Regions:
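Conserved RecA-like P-loop NTPase helicase motor core
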Residues: 563-591, 644-762
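Walker A/P-loop NTP-binding motif
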Residues: 29-30, 49-65, 85-90
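Conserved helicase motor "Helicase C" RecA-like lobe of SF1/SF2 P-loop NTPases
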Residues: 613, 618-647
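Conserved interdomain hinge at the start of the Helicase C-terminal
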Residues: 513, 569-616
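SF2 helicase catalytic motif II
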Residues: 275-306
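A contiguous, basic/glycine-rich beta-loop/short-helix subdomain that forms a polymer-engagement track
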Residues: 227-252, 263-273, 421-578, 592-594, ...
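A substrate-engagement module of RecA-like helicase motors
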Residues: 2-11, 15-16, 63-255, 260-263, ...
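Conserved pre-motif I regulatory segment
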Residues: 1-41, 54
Length: 900
């Protein structure tokens, strides 16, 4: 369908649209027009991705002269692929709606939505259909003339170029390199085969020089290029898909990338250097963006890293340097001459790299063109002197880590001063150049195995990052802390393995340049409550911030909170929790496990198809399941549904997920045990029969003894005013909301959301739930396990009744006719409620409050007819617009008082 958001013509690839999608696009356009940052929370399953893409493509097309570029960030490769498929379907709709209408007759017939979906899933088939003129929609004469005008002006949406950018592991087509298992191995092998000095059989046949040197024949044509399309195009043209995508960054209108291409200082320059100030950056599923920033800006050096750097990597450098002095001293002299001539070090580092090695750039703040950063001291220009310095640095790290016996925390300035003293460095700015100088030397010496040098590289990155950010001009406290730990926290056995952490405590550090350098950054997700928390943590002021309610014609989601067991004699209400005081008490924990098992067994008999259960962590899940095994609950549960478990092995988890889906497909039913913050909780949808109920056992709090987290919480309380308990509650609820939100993918879907822990019913937790979940929770916030099962039975009986979605037209579902009543089919119009609100006269005293349908309230009407005065507070709409019943009730009360 085609409609207007004010003056903006929007093409939507489906025949129907939700009210939430329409409201979402209006707020998005309002933020784009303001050239400000946008913070939007939209309910899960209401088409957030396609709404974003539809509005952005329309905006790019309408404002083509301004040359906007959209960078769409996702978390996983699977989400990237789904986004590209949606974008391809949208481009097909543009051709059918705008491009096709200019050349077809009114007698042409329209394909069904299912045909369009099937045809759009294959890029080649879609292109062939468009070339043949098949499946084009007839429009009225006025709309036809508009389409012809847009085609003549060159504003057709189909001319946009969209490309996805990901790691070599996902794009490489070299038979040997692509067969490697790990991404780091693929990167190292690619750099070897694309190095300038590689030749003969070791040279990659798909690599044709640096990105800047690629011929025009390697330029991607307009259209949507998915990962599969890039690989097929590379095989057909004999070119590397990875470098073809990199080459297209500058000319592409839409880039779909992972978060790391925006926040990781090692790879973000690849994209950021091509962005203009008017670029639009979208962070989809941005509820964990602060954690992504913290992880990207933090580094860890283990004792084995420091030892390998000192004993192995430094020796490799020294041997290669001696060999170069013997056989090719000219290369070393040329390197020195270029450094002495004043050539900026970062530009020299990049120019000396091979095409593949260019993805090892400077860290943030390095190489900005400033004189002090590019002025390399004389003591580091000679290769001999730099190798001596890097040798001292590696030895310093090894000595520091080896001596640690107790956890310690150091201020960045103190640690920098110690490095300067031990390594004989005068100016701290010289340390900022460590990574770039090492990269220049590695390429000068033509070392092939860069993967083996990773231990020394991480130490150089550590020093560079610390020297760049050891002071912060924005806040009083620095955004980094150096942490010594005698045990690696990732080692479950707690073997003595000391590590040195450079821990980032300020999440805004990774995106500060993004928010300051670009007009619009869109942060959106289904779980962003409370909205102000993200603005405070990331250090920006949103121009538009809104949480949308969910309009439902039937109650297709049923969130409940279970706080107590039916075994009142053995287990009291306050003990049904995963709190530490309960877990360390064997009697209480046994009762909690028994209550969990009783609830799950009854749900397995009530809930059809699939049930997904989330625990707070692997350890807690193991303890509970071990108790169930010894008690016989697992055996009894397996008779009702098959059991699958997420493990820490990626391959095992993927296989378990495949078999779980298969069990649901054949009607056997299954239960999938997973953990919050795990692989399944993020990005895996359990729509339709794959997830008719999601159970969250316990509150997924962050570990209390995590030292980097403690330092981050101290920093946030001192600088941002966010207390320890406030952030822990916020993080736990957003993780739980993300888990239970997996159950709903569209309004025709349905499922139960069950939170099993008494702490979820506390106000400090419940008020942080997304508004669209709290809106449907009603009074189900203090249930026993038996009451929960009773509600589940009633819910699934109700969902089993026949339901015609077409009855929702005009209320929770809009077609073109319904959009016409909203004023969306006329260019430049506005919704009736907004016009009525602007032209409304002031209310007289005693006048009835208008309902949501009449324009009252700041938010759209909720499913039960109530107006939403905020993201999670429904206010009952007036049911007596004339005030008659109110006067009668007052008169009756007066008579009653007189009679007494």
């Amino acid at each position: 369908m085609r409609f207007f958001i004010e003056e903006l013509p929007v093409v939507f690839p489906y025949d129907f649209i939700y009210p939430e999608q329409l409201a979402y696009m209006r707020e998005l356009k309002r933020g784009l027009d303001k050239r400000g940052h946008i913070l939007l929370e939209m309910p899960s399953g209401t088409g957030k991705t396609i709404s974003l893409l539809s509005l952005l493509v329309a905006y790019l097309t309408h404002h083509r002269a301004e040359k906007h570029k959209v960078v769409y960030c996702t978390r996983t490769v699977q989400e990237m692929s789904k986004t590209m498929e949606e974008l391809k379907r949208l481009m097909l709709a543009w051709h059918r709606t705008v491009g096709g209408s200019a050349v077809i007759d009114d007698g042409d017939t329209q394909r069904s939505a299912s045909d369009v979906k099937r045809e759009a899933s294959d890029g080649a088939a879609a292109t062939a259909l468009l070339a043949a003129g098949v499946g084009k929609t007839p429009f009225a004469a006025g709309r036809r003339r508009m389409a012809e005008s847009e085609v003549q002006k060159g504003s057709l949406g189909g001319e946009l170029t969209a490309v996805c950018l990901t790691a070599r592991k996902n794009l490489c087509i070299h038979p040997e390199v692509s067969a490697l298992t790990y991404a780091s191995e693929v990167d190292a092998a690619c750099r070897i085969k694309t190095a300038r000095w590689s030749g003969g059989t070791s040279k990659c046949q798909f690599y044709h020089g640096d990105i800047e040197d690629l011929a025009p024949s390697f330029t991607l044509p307009p259209g949507v290029h998915t990962l599969q399309d890039l690989r097929q195009l590379g095989e057909a043209r004999g070119m590397c898909p990875y470098f073809a995508a990199r080459h297209a960054i500058e000319t592409a209108d839409i880039l779909v990338v992972s978060y790391l291409y925006i926040v990781d200082p090692k790879v973000s320059p690849v994209v950021r250097k091509h962005l203009r100030a008017n670029s639009i950056v979208v962070m989809d599923e941005g509820h964990n963006v602060d954690d992504v920033c913290i992880e990207a800006m933090s580094l860890l050096v283990s004792k084995s890293d420091a030892q390998s750097a000192r004993d192995s990597n430094v020796k490799m450098l020294q041997d290669a340097l001696e060999q170069a002095k013997t056989h090719n001293r000219q290369r070393l002299q040329e390197e020195y001459d270029r450094l002495v001539s004043g050539l900026a070090l970062t530009r020299l580092a990049v120019s000396s790299m091979s095409g593949a090695a260019r993805e090892m750039p400077a860290l943030p703040g390095v190489g900005d063109g400033g004189g002090e950063l590019d002025a390399l001291p004389a003591s580091l220009r000679h290769a001999n002197q730099f190798v001596t310095f890097i040798s001292r640095l590696a030895d310093f790290f090894y000595r520091i880590i080896s001596r640690m016996t107790q956890p310690q925390t150091a201020d960045p300035s103190t640690f920098i001063a110690k490095i300067k003293e031990d390594c004989n460095i005068v100016d701290v700015t010289h340390l900022r150049l460590t990574t770039d100088r090492l990269q220049v030397l590695l390429n000068t010496l033509q070392l092939r195995d860069l993967y083996a040098m990773r231990h020394l590289v991480i130490i150089a990155d550590f020093v560079t990052l610390l020297a760049t950010h050891y002071k912060d001009n924005r806040y009083a406290l620095p955004g980094y802390v150096v942490i010594f730990e005698p045990f690696d926290p990732q080692d479950a056995i707690n073997r003595p393995d000391p590590v040195l952490r450079l821990s980032c405590v300020d999440a805004s550090m990774a995106v500060r340049g993004l928010f300051e350098g670009h007009h619009t950054v869109v942060l959106t997700s289904g779980t962003l409550s409370p909205l102000d928390m993200y603005a405070r943590m990331l250090g920006f002021v949103p121009a538009v911030a809104k949480s949308f309610p969910m309009t439902l014609s039937r109650r297709c989601i049923c969130p409940v909170i279970v706080t107590r067991s039916t075994e009142q004699a053995d287990l009291m209400c306050e003990d049904l929790t995963s709190a530490y005081k309960v877990r360390v008490d064997d009697r209480l924990q046994s009762g909690v496990s028994r209550a969990y098992a009783g609830l799950l067994l009854q749900l397995a008999q009530t809930v059809p198809d699939g049930i997904v259960c989330f625990f707070t962590g692997y350890k807690y899940m193991g303890e509970v399941m071990l108790n169930w095994y010894h008690s016989g609950y697992l055996r009894e549960l397996s008779r009702l549904k098959l059991i699958f478990v997420e493990t820490q092995d990626v391959a095992e988890t993927a296989e378990a997920l495949r078999n779980y889906r298969r069990a649901c497909d054949i009607g056997r039913g299954a239960v999938f045990f997973s953990i919050a913050r795990g692989k399944i909780a993020e990005g895996i949808d359990f729509d339709r029969h794959y997830g008719r109920a999601v159970v969250m056992f316990g509150v997924p709090f962050l570990p209390p003894d995590d030292r980097p987290l403690k330092e981050r919480l101290k920093w946030m309380e001192a600088v941002l005013g966010i207390t320890d308990s406030e952030f822990r509650n916020f993080d736990a609820v957003r993780q739980a909301s993300q888990c239970i939100g997996r159950v709903l993918r569209n309004k025709t879907d349905y499922g139960m959301m069950i939170l099993v822990d008494r702490r979820f019913s506390l106000p400090d937790k419940r008020k942080k739930l997304p508004g669209w979940i709290a809106q449907q929770m009603r009074d189900n916030t203090n249930l026993s396990t038996e009451a929960c099962v009773s509600i589940a039975r009633d819910f699934f009986v109700e969902m089993a009744q026949p339901w015609d979605q077409m009855k929702d037209l005009g209320r929770t579902l809009f077609d073109e006719a319904a959009l016409a009543t909203q004023g969306a089919m006329v260019q430049g119009s506005e919704p009736p409620e907004l016009a009525a609100r602007r032209h409304a006269t002031p209310l007289a005293i005693g006048a009835p409050i208008p309902t949501a349908a009449e324009g009252g309230g700041r938010f759209p009407a909720a499913a039960d007819g109530s107006a939403m005065d905020g993201p999670s507070r429904p206010i009952r709409a007036a049911r007596d617009p004339t005030g008659t019943e109110q006067r009668r009730a007052a008169a009756g009360a007066k008579r009653g008082r007189g009679s007494t």
